[in-house]
UniProtKB/Swiss-Prot annotation:
Keyword tRNA processing included in the entry's annotation: yes
InterPro entries: Domain_X, Maturase_MatK, Maturase_MatK_N
One Gene Ontology biological process: RNA splicing
Signal peptide feature range: none
Molecular functions (GO terms): RNA binding
Function: Usually encoded in the trnK tRNA gene intron. Probably assists in splicing its own and other chloroplast group II introns.
Entry keyword annotation includes Chloroplast: yes
Family stated for the protein in its record: Belongs to the intron maturase 2 family. MatK subfamily.
Superkingdom of origin: Eukaryota
GO CC aspect terms: chloroplast
Name of the protein this chain belongs to: Maturase K
UniProt keyword annotations, A-Z: Chloroplast, mRNA processing, Plastid, RNA-binding, tRNA processing
Chief site of localization: plastid
Amino acid sequence: MEEFKRYLELDRSQQHNFVYPLIFQEYIYALAHDHGLNKSILLENAGYDNKSSLLIVKRLITHLITQMYQQNHFIFSANDSNQNKIFGHNTNLYSQMILEGFAVVVEIPFSSRLISFLEGKEIVKSKNLRSIHSIFPFLEDKFPHLNYVLDILILHSIHLEILVQTLRYWVKDASSLHLLRFFLYEYRNWNSLITPKKSSFSFSKRNQRLFLFLYNYHVCEYESIFIFLRNQSSHLRSISSGTFFEQIDFYEKIEHFVEVFTKDFQAILWLCKDPFMHYIRYQGKSLLASKGKSLLMNKWKYYFVNFWQCYFYMWSQPGRIHINQLSNHSFDFLGYLSSVRLTPSMVRSQMLENSFLIGNAIKKFDTLVPIIPLIGSLSKAKFCNVLGHPISKPVWADLSDSDIIDRFGRIYRNLSHYYSGSSKKMNLYRIKYILRLSCARTLARKHKSTVRAFLKRLGSELLEEFFTEEERVFSLTFKKASSTSRGLYRRRIWYLDIICINDLANHK
């Protein structure tokens, strides 16, 4: 670990040039193990201890690199166990280990916080690393004043060579990039790494660390160019063409084309200029909202389609970008069904002896629980059928009664906690009913009894498990003033401890 610290303390330019030797260091794979990203692969290899396993990894890397430079490429077949062995060991197993370690190595040039983590220092919290619930107060503040929104699904597929060439401007170690290119092309047919799609690929979730790094880097590259163009549009004319091209990281600079291209691009940006433009993204979905007219949003849509096609060489389907008017359409974002609706209000005004009513409409940001997709997620998880009728959970029937009740109660509390910002929480009662009755059916199945008998015997206890913290606080504090309690319960509450969407709320 001390050696790893010394490496991280090198100059940034030196780090870029000496990434390759780290692939042969055992502590890299130990570090990948310590992060807990795939412990079973490193530990559950029967017949070998950790040291011998890491030595086999190093031997396998050497063998792969020899094959790579001899142009004697090979592809592992998941159906042929004989072809999947090198040195008498399973190559898929050790290839997974290599990919985990390789992901750690490639991340090093991008990680400026690892030294603080290794030294036990407190990591300074970035403003970008806040709860995802912090997005909604921003939407409440900004979106009622906007007119249109671009609902964008970011492309998941990208050409292999484009990805490697993009990384080349950050990681200047040619050997590491050759090895990355080798992995991407040779393992294109290996389902645990990538999903084959001719010369492009979409990332697989089984290889979490490498998947997250490649996808985040892909999105970062996409956003760095887009956000730069958005921020610089108002004062682009004061930037020289040389600085302009350096900041965008164009890979081929044609001198006689610079002047013409810059002038044309200034005109494009001037057409798309809008001081009331807001951009928000979470995972693979982003929103671009504006106070402008539909013509401006169509120009931005045209820009996105051409940007993806010309820069990433990916054909963009028209259905990946939707233009919606906020007052007439809802959009699905972060598990909520959101919209901007007009709330009528009447104001009584009196002048001298005459009084009259003034009607006024106030724009309000509305967030609803998408009950139909949520029931669909519960159906996939085998808590109910497609119509929303609760069913038992047979796989949990072997657990103790307290564990079964605790699991069902925890699922509802998590969903209720996440959807605490909903404008109308009545839909959550439907979810509570499904989970509560599914729990009762599971217990009845376990004890070979009827649901009625269990609800009669454990009714109050079972109901208590599904009380959320907010309901408990309100019921204790406002026991007599029930109307006040109901009013507080209807209010939206955004929690700042939510860093990811619940799997059931994600509808995937």
